[in-house]
Amino acid sequence: MFDALARQADDPLLALIGLFRKDERPGKVDLGVGVYRDETGRTPIFRAVKAAEKRLLETQDSKAYIGPEGDLVFLDRLWELVGGDTIERSHVAGVQTPGGSGALRLAADLIARMGGRGIWLGLPSWPNHAPIFKAAGLDIATYDFFDIPSQSVIFDNLVSALEGAASGDAVLLHASCHNPTGGVLSEAQWMEIAALVAERGLLPLVDLAYQGFGRGLDQDVAGLRHLLGVVPEALVAVSCSKSFGLYRERAGAIFARTSSTASADRVRSNLAGLARTSYSMPPDHGAAVVRTILDDPELRRDWTEELETMRLRMTGLRRSLAEGLRTRWQSLGAVADQEGMFSMLPLSEAEVMRLRTEHGIYMPASGRINIAGLKTAEAAEIAGKFTSL
């Protein structure tokens, strides 16, 4: 029976990790893998996470099942962080998920169960978006969201896609810190998006994976909160991997903004049912850590301060890198004004390969770089290697 299976292609980013590890050159640089790294090249554990884990170790008295919906206090605290007081809490359904990927898959399965077949996806996007949606049976319509040579969001294309979408279609939006481009939507553009989505009867699915990495915790969800205040229905997939440094703990959630308490209850029951037939229930530890941090003023303050330090470091790295890159590409001065961990450089696959073989700089063939993979002292030198191609 197993002989009937075709071998699946390796994930390009995972393959890149393997190549990087085998490279014995001391000056090698990993700009591919999407994790935050500090000045020593480590992916640190937040101080508040360590403190919360210690507290849980001392106080947790059971490992019993928690159910498909997950930790309800975690969901309440996370929604307060994401949605604020934008809408009535009883109109929001939430289910804890195994990370942001689990949230996106549950959202896609819910859309399919409701009879929705199509979802609009701006390109480039996170490489796993399309496979997740396809696996749920959704048809994907695409449009060009970002122009790499000019380093600019093609907002007219986004507007045209929304205007051309059929009522009931879903549309994937990045809340902030766009992966992989770092492209930024203005407040006015978010207002136009919200008005169009409401007018066209579309269902927004908003991917929130980097809250606090762009302009700040509240600023990074300002557009999302405006959208939630305008549209009657929306889905929000939240990941705690980056904002809390809980990558391998798989802590996330899917939230549904509905128009009534009764509607929220229906959505919640369907999300829980979909979870039950998939992974049954989410892992508890990461969510318990997040809940503990957000519930404790001192831990929350410490977490917020450390997150802000990381954000400011990435902002500084962007400025240093952009200063060097603009000597070859004037448009890449825009890298300094982009948000989050990622930017996309106008490099060919051959140039990406040269960077790897000649300089030990590892990045995907697409030209996407992880800003947080740089060290401050080497940013100018790395920029010089890019511009020397």
UniProtKB/Swiss-Prot annotation:
The modification N6-(pyridoxal phosphate)lysine is found at residue 242. Its EC number is 2.6.1.5. The gene is tatA. It comes from the Bacteria. GO terms for molecular function: identical protein binding; L-aspartate:2-oxoglutarate aminotransferase activity; L-tyrosine-2-oxoglutarate transaminase activity; pyridoxal phosphate binding. Keywords: Aminotransferase, Phenylalanine catabolism, Pyridoxal phosphate, Transferase, Tyrosine catabolism. It catalyses: L-tyrosine + 2-oxoglutarate = 3-(4-hydroxyphenyl)pyruvate + L-glutamate. InterPro entries: Aminotransferase_I/II_large, Asp_trans, NHTrfase_class1_PyrdxlP-BS, PyrdxlP-dep_Trfase, PyrdxlP-dep_Trfase_major, PyrdxlP-dep_Trfase_small. Transmembrane segments: none annotated. Transaminase involved in tyrosine breakdown. Converts tyrosine to p-hydroxyphenylpyruvate. Belongs to the class-I pyridoxal-phosphate-dependent aminotransferase family. GO terms for cellular component: cytosol. One of its GO terms (biological process) is tyrosine catabolic process. The keyword Transmembrane does not apply. Pathway: Amino-acid degradation; L-phenylalanine degradation; acetoacetate and fumarate from L-phenylalanine: step 2/6. Homodimer. It comes from Rhizobium meliloti (strain 1021). It is an enzyme of class 2 (transferase). The keyword Transferase applies. Its cofactor is pyridoxal 5'-phosphate. This is Tyrosine aminotransferase. Disulfide bonds: none annotated.
